[in-house]
Swiss-Prot record:
Region (Disordered): 101-121
Membrane topology: Multi-pass membrane protein
Glycosylation site list: N17, N117, N496
Name of this protein: GPI-anchored wall transfer protein 1
Class of enzymatic activity (EC top level): transferase
InterPro entries documented for this protein: PIGW/GWT1
Gene Ontology cellular-component annotations: endoplasmic reticulum membrane
GO biological process, alphabetically ordered: GPI anchor biosynthetic process; protein localization to plasma membrane
Annotated transmembrane regions: 23-43, 55-75, 79-99, 130-150, 165-185, 218-238, 244-264, 270-290, 314-334, 363-383, 390-410, 447-467, 472-492
Superkingdom classification of source: Eukaryota
Amino acid sequence: MPDTASYKQQKEDFVSNLSGGSVAEINYVTSVAAVAILLWSVLQARQSFFEPYTALAFAVDFLLNVGAILLSVTLYSNSPLLLNLLLIAPAILVFTLPPRSRSPKKKAKIPPNARSNESSGQLDILSTKPFLTNFRGCMLIVTCVAILAVDFRLFPRRFAKVETWGTSLMDLGVGSFVFSAGLVAARPVLREKATGRAGAVGNALSLSSRLVQSLRHSIPLLVLGFIRFLSVKGLDYAEHVTEYGVHWNFFFTLGFLPPFVAIFQSVRKLIPSFAALSLLVGVTYQVLLETTSLKAYVLTAPRTDLISMNREGIFSFVGYLAIFLAGQDTGMFVIPRNLVPKSTASPGAQRNKLLKITAVWGGVWTGLYVLSTNYHYGFGLAVSRRMANLPYVLWVVAFNTIQLLGFAVIDTIFFPAFYNAQDAKTEKEAYTHATSRVMRAYNRNGLAVFLLANLLTGLVNMTVNTLDATPIATMGILVVYSAALTGVAVALDAYNISIKL
C-alpha cells in the first residue's frame, strides 16, 4: 500500500468534484435489471428452469440478477444497450420454444392435526406481489454493487455521486433506497386502516403510540450510524465530507425518518394523501432554498459548529423525507389486493387497474420533474442530491414509479396465476414460482445485507489498493464480493432466518 496520508487524499479526490452523467444513460443502465428479470421470467414461465432449485439454477439466477447488474456498471458501462440486447435475444429465443409442462409435485402426507393449518386458508387483505420483490431486490443489488465498485477505476466517474449539481447512478440509488423503504412502510398503515384501528383512538394517543413504535426502528439505525462514524474516524478511512457532512452518514438519515413519518401519519388526518404531503414538504423546502440564504448556507457555510459541520445531512433529510412519503403513497395502491375494498371486480380487472394507476402516477411525477427542470417551459431548476432539492425528489420518485410499472407488466404477462389465486396456499405457491430465490433472499434481509455490504466494502478498501487495480483484478474482487453477499442472503433465507434492524 502507498503512503497512508497521500493514498487517503487520492481516494477522497477520486470521488470528489464529479458532475455525473445524463438521465438517459442512467435509464439505459438501470433497464438492464428489468431486462434480466424479463429473461428470468421467460425461463421460469416457459421452461420451469428454476424448479427444482439446483446448483445450476442458483448459478444462472446469480448470473442473471446480480451478474448482469455488475456488468452494466463495469465492463458494459459504455454500451448498456448492447447488454440489454444480449439479454433480450435469449429471452425471445426461449419464448419461441415449446413450453415445458410442469410435472405435478407429489404431495406429502399431512398429519391430521396439521391439516387445518395446511388447508387453503383465506387470502390476506395485503399481498406480497412478485413485482415488488423484484423491484426491491434489484434496487438492493445495484446499491450493494455500486458502493464497492465506485472505489475502482473500472466504475465510470459519471456514475459516482456528484459534488453539487447533476444526476448520477449512485445519486439515484440512495434516493431509491429511501423510496423503497417508504413503499413497504405503507403496509402497516394499510393493515391498520383495513382492521378499523386507524381512528380508534384520539390524535394525541395515536401520535404518541406511533412515536414509541417508530423508536424501535430508529434506535438500531442510529446505533449503526454512530458505529460507522466511530469506525471511519478511528480507522482514518477516506470520506467525502460534502456528501453528508463531518459526522453524519446515511444510517442517520434512515434512523431519523421513522419518527418524522409517524408525525406526518397523524397529519394525514387533515391531508389524506402521502403524495400531497410529499409535495408539500418538497415544495416548501425548495421555496426556502430559493428565497432565503439556506442554499448558500448548505453549500458554502464554514463548518464552525455541529449543525454547520453536518449541514448537508441535516437539510437533505427534508428531501429524503419527501421521497419516503411519496414511496409510502405508492405503496398505498400497489400493495393492497383490491384497490377498492370489498370490490367485486375480477382479478384481471384489478390487475389492469393497478397498471393504469401506476402508469398515471408515473406520468404525473415525470411531468412534475420536467416542469421543475425545463428551462423553456418550467422553472429551470437543477438536480442536487447534496441538498436533496425538489428536482431530485421528483426525479427519484418518477424513476421508481416507472420502474415499478415495468416490473408489474412483466408479472402480468408471465405470471397471471398469482393474481388469479383463490386461497393463501395457492397464492404462496404462485408467488414462489414467480420470484427469483436470489431476489427473495435480498428482500428478506435487505438492511442486514446492506450493512454487510458496507462492512465488506470497508474491508476491501483497507486491504486492497483499489485505485491501481487492473480491470481483471477489479472484476475478480467484485464477483467474489457479490457472490459472498448473495450467498449469505440465500443461506439466511434457506435457514428461515430474518434479521430485523
